Amino acid sequence: MYVVTNRIDVKKGFAEKMAPKFTQGGKIQELEGFQKVEVWLIDDEADYDQMYINTWWDSEDDFKGWLKSDAFKEAHEGKSKTKSDDSPILGNKVVKANVISELS
């Protein structure tokens, strides 16, 4: 299993407004190896919200297929790489990991 986490820092109060956009469903669900998406709001005392958007895949290759897909392009169209003062997004970091041990 392969898990990708996009850690996104947003202005305080915006995480709960933005979270449904990541879990509304769509073409990602039809892609080979896709398992699920979860959005977490990190519980801390920061002056900003930190969201973790976690996607689970059967393999790294399946995740790479998502990155190359039309579904990925459609999900991210209109997103500017340049930050504006109006954007609630303060920054992000993507973390990729192979699950090497699990207890269910």
From Swiss-Prot:
Highest taxon listed in the record's lineage: Bacteria
Domain ABM: 2-95
Catalytic activity field: heme b + 5 AH2 + 4 O2 + 2 H(+) = delta-staphylobilin + Fe(2+) + formaldehyde + 5 A + 4 H2O; heme b + 5 AH2 + 4 O2 + 2 H(+) = beta-staphylobilin + Fe(2+) + formaldehyde + 5 A + 4 H2O
E.C. code: 1.14.99.48
Gene3D superfamilies referenced in this protein's UniProt entry, alphabetically: 3.30.70.100
Keywords in alphabetical order: Cytoplasm, Heme, Iron, Metal-binding, Monooxygenase, Oxidoreductase
Compartments reported by the entry: Cytoplasm
Lipoprotein recorded as keyword: no
Binding, Fe cation: N6
GO cellular component: cytoplasm
Chaperone listed as a keyword: no
Annotated site residue numbers, Transition state stabilizer: W66
Single biological process term from Gene Ontology: iron import into cell
Residue sites binding heme per the record: H76
Subunit and partners: Homodimer.
Function: Allows bacterial pathogens to use the host heme as an iron source. Catalyzes the oxidative degradation of the heme macrocyclic porphyrin ring to the oxo-bilirubin chromophore staphylobilin (a mixture of the linear tetrapyrroles 5-oxo-delta-bilirubin and 15-oxo-beta-bilirubin) in the presence of a suitable electron donor such as ascorbate or NADPH--cytochrome P450 reductase, with subsequent release of free iron.
Family: Belongs to the antibiotic biosynthesis monooxygenase family. Heme-degrading monooxygenase IsdG subfamily.
Protein name, per record: Heme oxygenase (staphylobilin-producing)
Native source organism of the sequence: Staphylococcus saprophyticus subsp. saprophyticus (strain ATCC 15305 / DSM 20229 / NCIMB 8711 / NCTC 7292 / S-41)
Gene responsible for this protein: isdG
